[in-house]
UniProtKB/Swiss-Prot annotation:
The keyword Zinc-finger applies. A zinc finger (Phorbol-ester/DAG-type) spans 134-185, 364-424. GO terms for biological process: lysosome localization; positive regulation of bone resorption; positive regulation of ruffle assembly. InterPro entries: C1-like_sf (IPR046349), DEF8 (IPR051366), DEF8_C1 (IPR047983), PE/DAG-bd (IPR002219), RH_dom (IPR025258). The keyword Repressor does not apply. It comes from the Eukaryota. This is Differentially expressed in FDCP 8 homolog. The lineage of its organism: Eukaryota, Metazoa, Chordata, Craniata, Vertebrata. Keywords: Metal-binding, Phosphoprotein, Repeat, Zinc, Zinc-finger. Interacts (via C-terminus) with PLEKHM1; this interaction is weak but increased in a RAB7A-dependent manner. Residues 17-47 are annotated as: Disordered. GO terms for molecular function: zinc ion binding. Positively regulates lysosome peripheral distribution and ruffled border formation in osteoclasts. Involved in bone resorption.
Length: 447
């Protein structure tokens, strides 16, 4: 009996946090037999009191032991969420720094903001592929990678926002920004134009652009009003801060003229164009700057290795073992190396400058020479014997100590060839045979 009386008194003094009727009753009238001091215990000093109106959702911050699960909120519209966010901010400021309660309040604030973003940008069913201005956009499925929209220059929250990436130029943007894009895909320019601006920073002046961004035509000024003008070192034109993010890129004109590989600030469009053109062999150095080979020793070595590989190519084309082993695929990343020795890409020049291309090309050269001179008997049988000295060693046109006749492709020792005033005995023999054929025509011409 005594226990029942104590339990009844306890229930009268302490309100049930899950019974809102008691809260409403306690707000208007006092429970019988309960003094105002005993009705609500005072909070200890330093603990802020969070009072939420009845019409606003319960954030779970006013009660420690019966808080709602993280992420569960009763807000149904944007206005309620904004009010809840402001109240949650105030609670965070009132709580002691680095306390557990403050950390929990910060977590709830984050979830409130995510919920607000969901209401402002609902997750609608978007098509997986969108084609716009030659862009081919694919809907991304990544939710954790942080990206920036190339159109509005804001962060893409992949967890709650739908975003797309162009497979041609890697242009990224929100789904809501797709219809605002006005710049065509750079991939089309690479496919049709495929050339570089080879003048170093060809500046024409801001007045030639009518004091507007060269891409989006927004008003710009050098004094920062209304928008800061940023110059692209590749095109020489000026852009606004939305079209020029101070990205760095190697400028091809500075490479071929000054052998300068220092990255410079370029616009977003120029950065994408240079990235797509990086591996395209469109630079003919002998025409652009032939003196570059006189001052860059690495280029001379690369040119010699490429010439040797072109001399090895006929051996591989006529060799079954080489075709089965697919030796020429060793250069599949630089297919132009097995086609000519004149065209270079910016990536080739960059790798030459760092030394990577010289090492990899020397290894490939050694592998090719080993197959021809040691591993394959058929390729060995296609070697030459010097007709000037008649020594027994087999010569190949890619050997460093040989010379090749430009007319008949015969191979000789270099010293022997120049000691005989570059006279080719094979060419002389073929000339005599042709003369004899014209003088004595008959049925046995091949005798």
């Amino acid at each position: 009996m005594e226990y029942d009386e104590k339990l009844a008194r306890f229930r009268q003094v302490h309100l049930n946090p899950f019974n809102k009727q008691q809260h409403e009753q306690g707000a208007g009238e006092e429970a019988p037999g309960i003094t105002s001091q005993a009705r609500l215990p005072e909070l200890p000093p330093g603990e802020p009191e969070f009072r939420c109106p009845e019409r606003v959702m319960d954030l779970g911050l006013s009660e420690d032991h019966f808080a709602r699960p993280v992420g569960l909120f009763l807000a149904s519209d944007v206005q309620q969420l904004r009010q809840a966010i402001q109240e949650c901010k105030q609670v965070i400021l009132d709580l002691p720094e680095h306390s557990e309660k403050q950390k929990d309040a910060v977590v709830r604030l984050i979830h409130l903001r995510l919920k607000l973003q969901e209401l402002k940008d609902p997750n609608e069913d978007e098509p997986n592929i969108r084609v716009l201005l030659e862009h081919r956009f694919y809907k991304e499925k990544s939710k954790s990678v942080k990206q920036t929209c190339d159109k509005c220059n804001t962060v893409i929250w992949g967890l709650i926002q739908t975003w797309y990436t162009c497979t041609g130029c890697y242009y990224r943007c929100h789904s809501k920004c797709l219809n605002l894009i006005s710049k065509p895909c750079v991939r089309s320019k690479v496919s049709h134009q495929a050339e570089y601006e080879l003048n170093i920073c060809p500046e024409a002046g801001l007045d030639s652009q009518d004091y507007r961004c060269a891409e989006c035509r927004a008003p710009i000024s050098l004094r920062g009003v209304p928008s800061e003008a940023r110059q692209c070192d590749y095109t020489g034109q000026y852009y606004c801060s939305h079209c020029h993010w101070n990205d760095l890129a190697v400028i091809p004109a500075r490479v071929v003229h000054n052998w300068d590989f220092e990255p410079r600030k370029v616009s977003r469009g120029s950065m994408r164009y240079l990235a797509l053109m990086m591996s395209r062999p469109v630079l003919r150095l002998r025409e652009i700057n032939p003196l570059l080979f006189n001052y860059v020793e690495e280029l001379v070595e690369i040119r010699k290795l490429r010439q040797d590989i072109l001399l090895m190519k006929p051996y591989f084309i006529t060799c079954r073992e080489a075709m089965a082993a697919r030796l020429l695929l060793q250069l599949q990343d630089r297919q132009h190396f097995v086609e000519n020795d004149e065209m270079y890409s910016v990536q080739d020049l960059l790798d030459t400058h760092t030394g990577r291309l010289g090492c990899s090309l020397a290894e490939t050269h050694t592998l090719f020479a080993k197959h021809i001179k040691l591993d394959c008997e058929r390729c060995q049988a296609k070697g030459f014997v010097c007709e000037l000295c008649r020594e027994g060693d087999v010569l190949f046109p890619f050997d460093s100590h040989t010379s090749v006749c430009a007319d008949c492709s015969a191979v000789f020792h270099r010293d022997c060839y120049y000691d005989n005033s570059t006279t080719c005995p094979r060419c002389a023999r073929l000339t005599l045979r042709k003369q004899s054929l014209f003088r004595e025509p008959g049925p046995d011409l091949d005798a």
